[in-house]
Amino acid sequence: YERYKQATNSDEITFSEFLSQYLTFTDETTTLAIQKNLLSVMKIYSEFVVSETYSSIRPGQSYVVSDTALCTGSAVIYDMCASEGGYTYIVTNYHVVYLEEADEALNGASKIARKIYGYLYGSESTPAASVNVSTNTVQKDENGYTKYDYGESAIALEYIGGSVSSDIAVLRAKTSDILAVNPCAAQVELADSYHVGETAIAIGNPEAQGISVTQGIVSVESDYISLNIDGSSRSYRSIRIDTALYSGNSGGGLFNAAGKLIGITNAGNSSDENINYAVPLEIVRGVADNIIYYHEKGYDAQCAYKIVLGIIVQTQNSKYVYDAGSGYGQIREEVVLDSVASDSIAESMNLQSGDIITAIIVNDTEYEIARSFDISDLILTLREGDVIQCVVQRNAQTVYSEEYTLSKTALVAIE
């Protein structure tokens, strides 16, 4: 782009216009992008203790058998610290490392996996029950549970936090441990945006058969699905794709044709073909950065944090707006305050029922609110000490709310 401006001695064309006019993606460039992405993906195995109750041959009696169980999924290398002693952060789905059926009392007082291992592409192995060669019997650990051998290429991963309501979990490993397996391992690149019709490439571990690639398109930018991960049904905002996904793809990366991450694949529709889902990049980035930030700050709740504004919103005048200059369009809507809770942050900012929120200013940077979920996405990025202010339309006038400085006491843990 810089060379183009120098050659033409012109600044009239924007970078996005330059891309749309002069940069095209062929099958070859997409293949090259996928090849690079293979340095940033992992397959995951999570180990739990589960207990099953069996009926005894004696009437009215039963007995319980406890043993290890393995679940598999996928992940992406999200952030690598190359400094000595640094950590690499890895993102997957919460449901890849959480098992509702786990025996909490025997699984380390948690339903999060007691052990998590990852494998880089090209260095993959499959865990197997350890066998005592001399007796030809399965080895047991100190608790009497089946012991698994994960192989030399397995990388031990530590769970540092997650959000069941976003279906995102963050793991970490010493960067040196990852580079010892593959010195070329790299973190993913994040896309700036994604659009309906855009190429959607999934890289994951379908059916635990090893890392593989499928390709489709983005069908719907923002859809809602219901998932039951921990015994409670929740609604999840998702990207709908027609890219083929299978069990084991969960937690894997969804990439565009340029090889940049646009989401984390997490669900499929078993009854309908070509309808699958991914956690949108805004949520992936918001939750992951949030968890990493507060983990490094010493917060020990293993979760993300947010503020509660104390508002209920409604939307109106939703429409699709096409930009001929960029060649892209988006759905836009008016976000109207339906109610403001007493003694809330919103009330202290002097927001009122009927206000139309058009933007939120964070530390002097203005962020447009074009959809209702833009508010919750932005809230994930807020940190203690940030100063926020709302821009609203009130009685056909543009009004700036009072400023509010986020305190530590305003933060609440996200499920």
Named regions from a protein language model:
Residues 94-113, 178-185, 203-216, 225-251, ...:
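Active-site loop architecture of trypsin-fold serine endopeptidases
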Residues 65, 160-166, 221-239, 295, ...:
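Gly/Ser-enriched beta-turn/beta-hairpin loop segments
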Residues 148, 156-158, 292-305, 349, ...:
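PDZ-domain C-terminal substructure recognizer with occasional recognition of PDZ-binding tails
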Residues 24-31, 51, 57-91, 154-158, ...:
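A conserved glycine-rich beta-strand in the N-terminal activation segment of trypsin-fold
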Residues 106-113, 273-276, 281-282, 359-391:
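PDZ domains, with a preference for the canonical peptide-binding region formed by the helix
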Residues 113-116, 128-131, 261-329, 411:
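C-terminal cap/linker of serine protease catalytic domains
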